[in-house]
A protein has these predicted regions:
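Generic alpha-helical propensity signal that fires on short helical segments
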Residues: 27-31, 67, 77, 150, ...
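Beta-strand/loop nucleic-acid-binding surfaces
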Residues: 34, 64-87
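Well-ordered beta-strand positions in beta-sheet-rich domains
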Residues: 44-46, 64-66, 106
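A residue-level detector for short acidic-glycine micro-motifs
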Residues: 49-51
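Short boundary/loop segments of OB/S1/cold-shock single-stranded nucleic-acid-binding domains
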Residues: 21-41, 83-85
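Short aromatic-glycine-enriched beta-strand elements
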Residues: 54-59
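Short nucleic-acid-contacting surface segments enriched for D/E, G, S/T with interspersed K/R
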Residues: 39-44, 76-99
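OB-fold/S1-family RNA-binding modules
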Residues: 1-25, 53, 86-193
């Protein structure tokens, strides 16, 4: 076990039960696979949302992967507007299709995977969510309870190690929930409505 240069924990598992242990760790905490041999063009990977600007998203998949704005596939608007519309928080795990190395003349731009686009659109079709960064699932759930809003949510989904999604019950206003819990939880939070 160690810490990578980008402050993510790295766990190497060996032995007879290694595949089972890897699966349990990945299911419990999520995973970003280290791609020491590089990424293969056309393959789907998971990276965390590192940053965004006017031209696209930068994902961390062991190496920085740039997804241009026109390859997000999440409707019109700038990447900043997409972040707000879908309630994306920094370090949120996102699936993407790697386009190829920047110096390769045959490379295509990287893009969000179709399954990822579907997941994000499903969030918008639901009753609303509040996405949280920098808090565990337990901390997030306890904060909702402390604020007196336990009946206003369905569950708290773990999206990543410290990235959670509070799924609102029918009739709950996500911006109102965010306002109610915001003073209790020092974290980045965004609504999906």
């Amino acid at each position: 076990m160690g810490v990578r240069d980008d402050d993510f924990v790295q766990v190497d598992v060996t032995g007879e039960d290694a595949p089972v242990a890897r699966n349990v760790l990945a299911e419990t905490w999520g995973e970003i696979v280290a791609h020491d041999g590089g990424l293969d063009a056309g393959e789907e990977y998971v990276g965390t949302l590192e940053s965004w600007d006017d031209v696209g998203f930068t994902l961390d998949a062991g190496v920085d992967v740039f997804v241009p704005a026109d390859e997000l596939g999440l409707g019109v608007g700038s990447p900043e507007q997409v972040v707000e519309r879908f309630g994306l928080v920094q370090h949120l795990p996102l699936r993407f299709v790697y386009g190829g190395d920047a110096g390769d003349p045959d490379a295509e731009p990287s893009r969000l995977a179709d399954a990822e686009r579907d997941r994000l659109y499903d969030w918008r079709r639901g009753d609303g969510r509040v996405n949280v960064n920098s808090a565990t699932r337990g901390e997030t759930r306890a904060t909702v309870n402390r604020a007196g809003h336990a009946q206003d949510i369905v569950t708290v989904e773990r999206l990543g190690l410290l990235e959670q999604s509070i799924v609102c019950a029918e009739g709950t206003d996500p911006p109102g929930l965010l306002a109610a819990i915001g003073s209790y939880l020092p974290a980045e939070m965004r609504c999906v409505v």
